[in-house]
Amino acid sequence: QKIISMYAKGMTTRQISETIEDIYGFETSEGFISDVTDKILPQIEDWQNRPLDEVYPILYIDAIHYSVRDNGVIRKLAAYVILGINTEGKKEVLSITVGDNESSKYWLSVLNELKNRGVKDILIICADGLSGIKEAIAAAFPKTEYQRCIVHQVRNTLKYVPDKDRKAFASDLKTIYHASDEEKARLALDRVTEKWTAKYPNSMKRWYDNWDAITPIFKFSPDVRKVIYTTNAIESLNSTYRKLNRQRSVFPSDTALLKALYLATFEATKKWTMSIRNWGRVYGELSIMYEGRLPE
């Protein structure tokens, strides 16, 4: 249990071996520690194949990148995390997959796997511009609304803006996604672009390119919007996953990465017992908006 707990915190087999020697005074090989952590692989498989609910009001899909050694070559792999908000307003990690081939075909297989595990309907999927995701959603869940992640949208815009302008620029961007309706949001978008485009020529291009996938949010009340664009749930999970990157720069294999991700997930989600704030109101609005698709 102690070994698995240390592995979940992102420690390498060598660090665990050294810690055990320091604390308990006996030597353990890295191979032994690897064998102990391998014992959770069947548990991981069961978790990854467990049945899911039929309906999820909201799903978030996000990617975190890691370096993995593969036959002596270091490759960059993405861990794709799917986080659901269930009908009780509680957060739940549905799936973690490791891959390097983002495409509509890949995403279709991921979404079909959710269907095979019992998911019949999803109201809204929030994701960043993952390659092929929009087409895959349309094929697997034709009634599902695709919403670009506002936090990523803002972050991508501010990436190349120096500190001296970042606060003012971020404040102006807020006028877009806090607008009361789509028309006012579009006017705000044009205003912000006009103000900053001379200084940062391409900063707002993605807003225009992605506008169709940004606009679904404007039909909702502030309560629902907050759930959609406040990505606290996925951000807190990501900070747990990023710790793994800080602990070790390269994972020795795909399996080692998967073990670390699952154990970190089990650790992080133990505390997830509460429903989202104002969930009753949010659920009521979604029930009206998506009539007949949510359980009464």
Where are these regions (language model features)?
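Short, amphipathic alpha-helical "recognition" segments used to contact nucleic acids or chromatin
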Residues: 1-10
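Amphipathic alpha-helical transducer elements in NTP-driven molecular machines
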Residues: 13, 34, 58, 76-79, ...
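DNA-recognition alpha helix
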Residues: 14-25, 263
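RNase H-like nuclease fold core
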Residues: 26-30, 35, 39-127, 131, ...
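Acidic/histidine-rich catalytic cores and adjacent linkers
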Residues: 142, 175-296
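Conserved beta-strand -> loop -> alpha-helix junction used to position metal-binding or nucleic-acid-contacting
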Residues: 124-131, 136-172
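Short, hydrophobic/aromatic alpha-helical segments in well-folded domains
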Residues: 2, 19, 110-113
